[in-house]
Structures are given as structure tokens and as C-alpha cells.
């Protein structure tokens, strides 16, 4: 598929290469994205506490995670695309304040119904903020550094996702699960001022589409862009595998013979940071034309991870190795996917990221729901078998949809 991005005539001249985005701004995008996405994942190491507090069975408590993913899906369809027709800076401010309110509401929930409604709102607004920031970063970056900037911001997302479990586990042991969401609300207020002061004015101006026309155009993008279709399905399968692991991990580790605290269980998220940091250059590799090779290696890492993960009952070191492989593969594939889709339609970054992440939300929700039910009936080995099958499907799908190798062109 042809890209709508035209290469500037001066690209080959290093002296005339456009100035890059300041490192401080790249870091702000990464930190803010990480804090926003963490809100969606705080519940994962708290499932046993939530089940006990609200009288929800282990087989059904995965519905708490699914509620956040339903919120994610609604955000991706209804809120994230607004960045293409509204002032992104003002949109960020309104969504951030609404997210703070949703976090406070979760901390005060007194029934399972109120909890699920609050989790849906957190998923809705946390996702809108996160993906809005990713699209913002892509639009603010020059074409020659888009992969690097998106990769850095997405690394912040991935690390925030992983550290959410550490944060939630530690705060829960100190102040209960309700304290986790109160602290999260305070963190969002703390990042509000730096975001408002530093977010740049995007080079692209908001479009003139009506909201109805905007939503309709998303369907057209989904039907027309093969890159989006292929990378979306890969994201669905990859995030299903990712959530199959992380949503189930708390259940065996909190039970005998381990009996780990929430802090100890959440600390396993720190191990995942190693894999995420190792994959941080995936966006740069995509900029250099190695997107398909990176995808293949990432998917193989995702599949191989399930072997050591299945040995957790005999060795926690095997669990550590498996987490590194799983997060390495997931992060590298995710960054590569986004780098590729952002190159298709520069004027539609918010809609593209919304559609792409809709696949992610569906995969995450299905993975969370399937893994808790699988664990209740088949234990940890059943979870690992499920993850292996989903990861293998992702690798096979990439193989049958990969583009043909380019033919060699003789140099003059």
C-alpha cells in the first residue's frame, strides 16, 4: 500500500535535516502516557481482594478487567477520534479532569455494580488520554523521527502498564485497594500542569468533519487500509496472549504454596520492564525499513515465552525468564505496529490509533475473561496452553499476510 507521506527533497542532506523533538518533551509524552495507561491496569493484581470485598467468585472476577476493556473499546470508537477535529490540548484537559473523577468514584464504590461502572469509566477515560497522547506525539514529531518518538511514548505506556502492578500491589498492602485509586487520582492531578504548559501546538489543524462524518470515516479507513487490518489482528492476538498471562498470575501466586503479598506479586512487573526497555528501539528499526523482521522476532519471542512460564510451579526463575520474553515480544510488536499504521494517513492519526487500539481492547478483554475461567477449570497449565495457542495463531497470521520480499534493484 502506498503511503501518503512524501519524503522531503532535503532528507538525504544531513545539514538540512529538520530539528528533532526536544528530549524533555519526548520524556513528558512517555511519562504522561505511562501514568494514564496505568489506571486501566491497577485492578489486575487486586482481583483476589476485589473478589473478597464484593463477594465475586474467581471464575467471574475477570469481569472487572473486562469492564475496563469495554470502556477502552468505547473510548477508541467515540473519544479518541475527536483529536482529528478538536483542539487536542483542550481535549486532553477535559478528559484528564473526568479521569480523576472516575478514579475517585472507584475508590468509593460500595457495590459490585458501582465498581463495574467505575471501572468502565476508568477504562474509557484512561484509554482516551493514553491514545490521545500517542496520536499527539505522532502528529508533533517530524516524519524522519516519528518512529523514534512514538516508540518512546509507547515504551512509557508499556512500562506504565507493567509498573501499575507494582504500584497497585505496594499501595494495596499499605492502604488497601481503595487507597490505590485515591493515589492514582492524585498522580493524574500532578501531571496535569506539566502537560498543559508543555504540550505543543500540532502542525496539523483540526479537520472540518462533523462528528457523524468522523465516525463514518473510521469505517472507511478500516475497510481501505490493509496495513491497519493486518496490524490490528496481530494486536488483538498479542494482547489476548498478554492478558491471558497477567490477569491469571495473581491467582496461583496468592494461593499456597506461594501465598505472596500483593507487593511481591506486583514486583514481577519490574521484571517486565527489562523486556520493554530492550524493545525500545523497535520504532527506530521500523524507521529504517526493518518492520517485518522486527515483527517476526517479536512474535517468536512471544511464543517461546510460554515454555518457561509453564515451568513456574517448579522454578520462579523460569517465570522471570518467561516474563522478559513475553514483554520483549509484546512491546517490540506493538511499537512496530503503530509506526507502520501512522505512516499511512498523517491527517488521521487519532482515528488510526483509535481503530488499531480497538483490536487491542477486544483482545485484552477476551484474554482476561478466558484466562480466569480457564484457571478455574484447568489451573496454571491450562492458562499456559491457552497462551501458547493464541501466540502461535499470531505468528501464523503474520506469516500468511506478510508482504513479498522486495526484488533486488541494480544500482546505476
Model-predicted segments: where are they?
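Helix-to-loop junctions at the C-terminal end of transmembrane segments
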Residues: 76-87, 277-290, 375
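Juxtamembrane intracellular "pre-TM" segments in multi-pass secondary transporters
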Residues: 10-19, 200-232
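Conserved MFS/SLC helix-loop-helix module at the cytosolic interface between two early adjacent transmembrane helices
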Residues: 74-112
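Paired small-residue
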Residues: 102, 113-121, 317-325
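C-terminal transmembrane helical hairpin of 12-TM major facilitator-type secondary transporters
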Residues: 292-337
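Helix-loop-helix hairpin linking two adjacent transmembrane segments in secondary transporters
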Residues: 152-197
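Cytoplasmic helix-loop-helix junction between adjacent transmembrane helices
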Residues: 118-157
